[in-house]
Amino acid sequence: MAAPGTVASVMASKTKTKKKHFVVQKVKLFRASDPLLSVLMWGVNHSINELSHVQIPVMLMPDDFKAYSKIKVDNHLFNKENMPSHFKFKEYCPMVFRNLRERFGIDDQDFQNSLTRSAPLANDSQARSGARFHTSYDKRYIIKTITSEDVAEMHNILKKYHQFIVECHGNTLLPQFLGMYRLTVDGVEIYMIVTRNVFSHRLSVYRKYDLKGSTVAREASDKEKAKELPTFKDNDFINDGQKIHIDENNKRMFLEKLKKDVEFLAQLKLMDYSLLVGIHDVERAEQEEVECEENDGEDEGESDGTHPIGTPPDSPGNTLNSSLPLAPGEFDPAIDVYGIKSHESAPRKEVYFMAIIDILTHYDAKKKAAHAAKTVKHGAGAEISTVNPEQYSKRFLDFIANILT
């Protein structure tokens, strides 16, 4: 029986002919409650399989930063319970993102497994922009919906971002961009980007902050506070009397890294980014584990094995190799790359997970207008968030340096 199409993808820059390729579904099933997630799982699986046949180049070429692979799928009646009948999947700059994954120490096979073995899990977090978040089932990666403007901005900065990652050997607090995709289902286009989770894949976070170094309108709303794991902000952090208790060596290394990252963002005229902070309380987690085990004893067979506290949106989660027994408060730094333990004399034994998020806001005319309007409303000296990129970076660094103790 002749196959109606061939499995192929176009890895070519936009200057080349855009050929559409039609594929037949293979027997691997991608079950997800949301058809878009099924398409994402299918697409990532297809993309990694295709890339495995493409030789790794000695160096990336300028065209790699404009390239894409694009595929159209006609499902007909196969697996129609799980997949839409017709969809398109586009991956941007596949060779560049493969190179970035390698530089961040992420194996493509592991990446593929994390995103396709089981459906990503929805987070209750929603950005002000309306972006939705999902976490890979093993909590290692975050999938975020983005706008076409974000895709354009990623293309604008990708070459410089890649160069920066090469120069710092992947040792950065910037988001680790691992793949960018466009999914088309029923004529609707959705853009998604995958990053490494900031938070731990196994240590639960009980308190979460999004810090910008600004104090105007920087409190969590009542609606946000009602969530299981709210995202608190700068004024909440100050009012809680919160501090990050890390030793001098960790503090020095963290601030050096942060300074380089933020200077890079200022050069690119990027702003409005945040430091995402997640706090794991070691004693609290131990206590909850004891209670969990006691409950498991009473309700044997009913537990789903999940932690009582969920993992926040912009972070990592349950791993493929979690078989290694780790002591309370311990983590694998190869996976939980952002983790820092509290110092010996800290009031509580904690682990902090901290990294920069949301870097794709460019200081353009819209931001300048917002700055002017807020200055009129709050006064020139107010700590508003829409200052220029140089001011933003300085204020951000000063604020973060002051909360480390």
UniProtKB/Swiss-Prot annotation:
Q: Name one GO cellular component term.
A: plasma membrane
Signal peptide positions on this chain: none
Where is the region Disordered? 287-326
Which biological process annotations from GO are given for this protein?
A: 1-phosphatidyl-1D-myo-inositol 4,5-bisphosphate biosynthetic process; autophagosome-lysosome fusion; phosphatidylinositol phosphate biosynthetic process; regulation of autophagy; vesicle-mediated cholesterol transport
Regarding how it is modified after translation, the entry says: Phosphorylated in tyrosines. Phosphorylation is induced by light and increases kinase activity.
Q: Where is the composition biased (Acidic residues)?
A: 288-303
* Class of enzymatic activity (EC top level): transferase
Reactions catalysed according to its record:
a 1,2-diacyl-sn-glycero-3-phospho-(1D-myo-inositol-5-phosphate) + ATP = a 1,2-diacyl-sn-glycero-3-phospho-(1D-myo-inositol-4,5-bisphosphate) + ADP + H(+); 1,2-dihexadecanoyl-sn-glycero-3-phospho-(1D-myo-inositol-5-phosphate) + ATP = 1,2-dihexadecanoyl-sn-glycero-3-phospho-(1D-myo-inositol-4,5-bisphosphate) + ADP + H(+); 1,2-dihexadecanoyl-sn-glycero-3-phospho-(1D-myo-inositol-5-phosphate) + GTP = 1,2-dihexadecanoyl-sn-glycero-3-phospho-(1D-myo-inositol-4,5-bisphosphate) + GDP + H(+)
Instruction: Report the residue ranges that make up the PIPK domain in this protein.
Output: 32-404
Q: Which InterPro entries would you find in this protein's record?
A: PInositol-4-P-4/5-kinase_C_sf, PInositol-4-P-4/5-kinase_core, PInositol-4-P-5-kinase_N, PInositol-4/5-P-5/4-kinase
What is the purpose of this protein? Catalyzes the phosphorylation of phosphatidylinositol 5-phosphate (PtdIns5P) on the fourth hydroxyl of the myo-inositol ring, to form phosphatidylinositol 4,5-bisphosphate (PtdIns(4,5)P2). Has both ATP- and GTP-dependent kinase activities.
Give the multimer and partner information.
Answer: Homodimer.
Its recorded name reads Phosphatidylinositol 5-phosphate 4-kinase type-2 alpha
Q: Which gene encodes it?
A: PIP4K2A
